[in-house]
Amino acid sequence: MRASLIQIGVKDDETVEFRRQRVASLVVEAGREGSDLVVLPELWTTGAFAYESFAAEAEPLHGPTYEVMAKAASDAGVWLHAGSVPERTPSDGGSATGDGPLYNTSLLFSPSGELAATYRKIHRFGFDKGEAVLMAAGAELVTVRLPETTLGLATCYDLRFPELFRGLVDAGAETLVIPAGWPERRQSHWTLLARARAVENQAYVLACGTAGTHARVPQAGRSIVVDPWGEVLAEAGTDEEVLTVEFDPARVGTTREQFPALKDRMLGLDAPRR
């Protein structure tokens, strides 16, 4: 299976619509070069730290980014994880103005351009500010069966919560896809956690970040693909880049069979008394 991670440079002086079209052309190019799966970063239309832009640039699920990315997936003939967008939802009263809560929502399209899945980010970053107060939390784990593998979907800060990934694996995930907007100052955590999630779940990890600087926050870049044994198959630099790698989905089953650590889990034990 061939995957391309498009590490987008989010530039403050670039309009959102121009960026959509620019990214769509990169998706189509990846498809022409033989990729089966293309992955984009988190919140690439706004920038993950451009908090003041979330409300202004939020869009309904079937909004402009949906339309452009659906066409790109179809034109490219690829499975497209289109990263995430700030999704504006209808109010409880069903208002057409979409004044309900915002979500950090990932979109996955099939090679025909149909929406195959959405995932609303569960763990929001910011503690008592930023995304944590501007967006609502998702509540559902999402896996998607592709012909070659089963994807488990997560987003950025989710990477720090191993129980989410164990839940995805229990639901059948073999390839963990993680779009992100990870800052440069915590780049070492990014690499370490991506490899840890691969090792402990005996799964592939495809983690796609953003490049450059936006909202005065330098981005880590360093998109990475890790195999089920924790070996790094490919890693990007810090600039905008298309990281393409070939990987064998059957390696997940082989690894789990030859080193069946997941079968030795001892869940359900009582916590030790203090």
Functional labels for PLM-detected ranges:
Residues L61-H81, L159-L243:
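CN hydrolase (nitrilase-like) catalytic-core segments centered on the catalytic cysteine
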Residues D13-S112, T118, P183-A203:
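Cys-nucleophile CN-hydrolase/nitrilase-fold catalytic domain and related Cys-dependent amidase chemistry
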Residues T118, T143, T210-R274:
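C-terminal beta-strand edge segments of enzyme domains
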Residues Q7-D13:
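Short polar catalytic/cofactor-binding loops
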Residues I8, L43, G83-V85, T155, ...:
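Active-site-proximal beta-strand/loop segments in catalytic clefts of secreted hydrolases
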